[in-house]
């Protein structure tokens, strides 16, 4: 990897050395010499057969967005809609805010089904067990706009563009100075940010730099009255935790509450430890983005973008607990023999505090050459890195050492306290400094060259084409384990690499156009694209796409497309990054294979935990058809409607080996030891050969008859998702004497959302997946002279809950309705303190609505479905010089 990085940086330096300074010249503040179009590689044409949604720089100001991820949260097609993305929560391996269109999720692949780009270039992955790019690595103030295409795009961009493509478009140039910031707060919460952009344009180019610092505080679950971790199977609801203070003592299957330092007969001590845990982590972030453009010659342009982000998140994991620690008979009583669980009572490490640090940087030098006859070469080099690190006090402490402490009397598991002796205090210090540590570093070197231009002319217009090639080298390195503070280097790193070589082409054919239009066909354009990607770890995949735009009249478009896309398995989820282990446990403990019910004296060998072996790409077929209208009879009105369907197969998932139906649901995830096909030593050795601890089960390898089955609990290509729905929007703007009034509605209605854990498992629909049919955003507002005012109603629809033991007292989740207000005041003054100033006020969740009640755990949330900070007010000011 080092050779690739050195070579890449050397190339970038060589390009930069060819740039010469020129005399400064006054130019407009922002110019766009060439509009970058997302969804196609052909200049001058919009993506055929698809809807392109754009969030402009002005929209960013109106939203009061501090994070780029907040921009997507305003779109009903994104999973963050009517929600707020959050990262760095305690113990989480998900350390980024990744875009997620069509609610497809990343599954267990460690990558994302929505592709994130910066000026059409991939961002590095960032995470510990995933390599999704982070939207918030790029500050909103540095963006010209954000393009969103909620449609399969692998034929153009390659991997991960299944649910769609999000392209962050940076400023082309900037002249002057802009400074600003925001300050806002909610109950028990505050946040603020400051930003500055400075730049200069000159006769042959421009240079600019944008910096942003933001900070927000921490919210505990106890700061919000709707979040709890309760046992919802009984009434009244009680705390779901048994690790309490005082705790509990378990002997066999009987739980004894601990009272006055001893176990007694009675109902267990229960508690809700979530109230002292993080609901929203504290975070501080530095972001930097710089741009440089220079015309090397009349036909050759050099472009350079560089970015850096550093983010620190702080979390409180709540009370630290011990579990499964044996209690000596002198402590527990001679009649009892068992284990104790409770909360440490020593304040030095009574809580599990954690920190997550993420850093990312990238350098993108680019050359654009005009080759004549309207042909262009666009070539870039992309060198980037994402680094995530997380450390936290380990839940349960150093269990083997703690068990020894309990046995020798330095730790009392019935009270959670260490002895006051020197030995007891030394034992406490060891536990207080015992941390879990995990890190992931994703490094990419990526280069691409695209030729595009006209081939020939038809009566309908010029047939244009684009073709080219791309190469990427990626390396991922992970550390994951427990160690004392200052000794994290003792955790062995694991690295894995891949190379990707790609070739692609695209064609746009205007069959009817301005010169040959006829009645009923004002224009008709067909496009075709295809891309072949060859991965060094799993081979090749080809993804085509065909699209059509038909305009019966100039203001009415009918469009459609069909294509294939894929999501590559993340390097972070492979066995190379996470070496698998093997576990031996008694057969029948989770249930037996109905065909072979005799489990007596047998043992199951399970590959778990660890990364997947021989993972293949997750593949999708996508198609959509829609229509757009801008009727001249109703000036200011525009509307669109799209039907889409996605068949997403071969999805990466982890088999549920703990289910009694495992042998029925996952027939490809085990090998039975049967009289007709007995396992051999060689088979067992081959099956568990990749496990780092294979030597620990040698007794079963040498005695195959004792093995009931070989089971694979690692990530595999098993699952599928089929979803369909309607996207719609209607917008109207009407000029008035005082400015204008406007109103709009946008939403998505999910018709189907069917998942299967395996090809043979039961199909789970919308309700079983906790997916609402409707997500809707309605706006109304006005431009009154210098004042812009808008009210937004965001609605996430309710859904039914399948009857289970965990939610026996609830049959449906109610809708979630939130009202937001936005005001922007832009004085027209051309001189004085108000010249170039903009003031904003945002009030989110005006009526302080809580998310709807939910009787159980929903995606890690207990007692509620959704997320809100509560009523949140924020003031902002920006000044241009």
Give names to the regions the model predicted.
Residues 27-29, 173-176, 203-204, 297-300, ...:
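Short loop/turn motifs that connect adjacent beta-strands in outer-membrane beta-barrel proteins
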Residues 109, 116, 219, 223, ...:
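Surface-exposed, low-complexity loop segments enriched in small/polar and acidic residues
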Residues 68-71, 97-102, 117, 134-136, ...:
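N-terminal periplasmic accessory domains that precede
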Residues 397, 647-649, 751, 794-802, ...:
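C-terminal beta-signal and adjacent terminal beta-strands/loops
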Residues 73-121:
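Extracytoplasmic beta-strand/coil segments of soluble accessory domains associated
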Residues 581, 743-831:
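C-terminal beta-barrel architecture of Gram-negative outer-membrane proteins
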Residues 121-150:
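Short acidic/polar hinge/loop motifs at secondary-structure boundaries
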Residues 33-69, 93:
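N-terminal periplasmic "start-of-domain" segments of outer-membrane beta-barrel proteins
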């Amino acid at each position: 990897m080092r050779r690739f990085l050195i070579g890449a940086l050397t190339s970038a330096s060589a390009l930069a050395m060819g740039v010469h300074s020129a005399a400064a010249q006054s130019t407009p503040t922002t110019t766009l010499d060439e509009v970058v179009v997302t969804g196609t590689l052909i200049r001058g044409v919009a993506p055929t057969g698809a809807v392109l949604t754009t969030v402009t720089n002005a929209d960013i100001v109106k939203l009061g967005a501090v994070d780029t991820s907040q921009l997507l949260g305003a779109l009903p097609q994104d999973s963050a809609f009517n929600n707020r993305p959050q990262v760095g929560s305690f113990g989480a391996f998900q350390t980024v805010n990744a875009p997620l269109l069509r609610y497809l999720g990343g599954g267990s692949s460690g990558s994302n089904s929505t592709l994130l780009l910066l000026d059409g270039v991939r961002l590095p992955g960032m995470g510990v067990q995933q390599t999704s790019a982070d939207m918030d690595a790029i500050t909103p103030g540095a963006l010209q706009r954000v393009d969103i295409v909620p449609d399969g795009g692998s034929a153009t961009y390659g991997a991960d563009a299944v649910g769609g493509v999000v392209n962050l478009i940076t400023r082309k140039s900037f002249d002057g100075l802009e400074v600003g910031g925001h300050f806002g707060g909610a109950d028990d919460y505050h946040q603020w940010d400051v930003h500055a952009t400075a730049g200069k344009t000159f006769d042959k180019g421009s240079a600019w730099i944008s910096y942003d610092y933001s900070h927000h505080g921490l919210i505990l679950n106890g700061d919000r009255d709707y979040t709890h971790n309760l046992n919802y199977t009984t009434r009244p609801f009680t705390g779901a935790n048994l690790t309490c203070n005082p705790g509990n003592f378990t002997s066999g299957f009987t739980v004894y509450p601990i009272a006055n330092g001893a176990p007694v007969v009675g109902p267990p001590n229960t508690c809700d430890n979530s109230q002292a845990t993080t609901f929203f982590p504290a975070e501080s972030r530095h972001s930097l983005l710089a741009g440089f453009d220079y015309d090397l010659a009349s036909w050759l342009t050099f472009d350079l973008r560089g970015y850096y982000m550093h983010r620190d998140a702080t979390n409180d994991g709540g009370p630290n607990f011990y579990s499964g620690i044996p209690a000596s008979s002198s402590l527990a009583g001679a009649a009892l023999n068992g284990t104790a669980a409770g909360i440490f009572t020593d304040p030095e490490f009574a809580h599990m505090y954690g920190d997550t640090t993420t850093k990312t940087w990238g350098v993108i030098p680019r050359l654009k050459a005009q080759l004549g006859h309207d042909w262009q070469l666009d070539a870039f080099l992309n060198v980037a890195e994402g680094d995530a690190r997380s450390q936290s006090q380990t839940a349960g402490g150093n269990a083997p050492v703690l068990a020894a402490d309990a046995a020798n009397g330095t730790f009392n598991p019935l009270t959670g306290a260490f002895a006051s002796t020197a030995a007891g205090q030394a034992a406490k210090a060891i536990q207080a400094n015992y941390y879990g540590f995990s890190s992931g570093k994703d490094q990419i070197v990526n280069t691409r060259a695209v030729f595009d231009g006209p081939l020939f002319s038809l009566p309908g217009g010029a047939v244009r084409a684009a073709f080219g090639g791309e190469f990427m080298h990626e390396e991922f390195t992970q550390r994951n384990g427990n160690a004392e503070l200052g000794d994290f280097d003792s955790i062995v790193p694991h690295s894995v690499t891949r190379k990707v070589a790609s070739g692609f082409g695209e064609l746009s054919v205007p069959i009817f156009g301005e010169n040959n239009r006829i009645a009923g066909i004002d224009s008709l354009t067909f496009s075709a694209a295809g891309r072949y990607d060859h991965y060094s770890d799993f081979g090749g995949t080809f993804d085509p796409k065909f699209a059509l735009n038909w305009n019966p009249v100039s203001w009415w478009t009918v469009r459609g497309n069909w294509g294939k896309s894929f999501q590559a398995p993340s390097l972070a989820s492979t066995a190379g990054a996470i070496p698998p282990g093997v576990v031996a446990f008694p057969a029948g403990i989770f249930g037996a294979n109905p065909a072979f019910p005799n489990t007596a004296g047998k043992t199951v060998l399970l590959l778990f935990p660890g990364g997947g072996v021989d993972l293949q790409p997750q593949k999708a077929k996508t198609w959509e058809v829609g229509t757009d209208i801008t009727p001249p009879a109703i000036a200011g009105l525009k509307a669109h409607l799209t039907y889409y369907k996605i068949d997403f197969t071969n999805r990466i998932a982890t088999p549920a080996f703990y289910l009694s139906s495992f042998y029925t649901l996952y027939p490809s995830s085990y090998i039975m030891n049967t009289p007709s096909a007995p396992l051999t030593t060689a088979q067992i050795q081959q099956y568990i050969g990749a496990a780092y601890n294979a030597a620990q089960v040698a007794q079963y390898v040498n005695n195959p008859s004792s093995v009931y089955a070989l089971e694979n609990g690692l990530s595999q290509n098993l699952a599928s998702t089929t979803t369909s729905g309607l996207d719609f929007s209607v917008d109207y703007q009407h000029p008035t004497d005082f400015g204008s009034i406007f109103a709009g509605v946008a939403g998505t209605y999910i018709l189907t959302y069917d998942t299967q854990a395996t090809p043979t498992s039961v199909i789970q629909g919308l309700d079983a997946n906790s997916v609402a049919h409707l997500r809707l955003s309605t706006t109304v507002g006005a431009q009154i002279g210098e004042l812009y005012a808008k009210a937004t109603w965001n609605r996430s629809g309710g859904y039914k809950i399948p009857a289970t033991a965990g939610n026996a007292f609830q049959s449906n989740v109610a809708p979630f309705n939130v009202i937001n207000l936005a005001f922007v005041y832009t004085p027209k003054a051309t001189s004085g303190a108000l010249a170039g100033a903009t003031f904003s006020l945002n009030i989110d969740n005006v009526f302080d609505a809580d998310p709807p009640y939910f009787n159980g755990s929903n995606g890690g949330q207990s007692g509620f479905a959704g997320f809100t900070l509560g009523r949140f007010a924020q003031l902002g000011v920006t000044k241009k010089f």
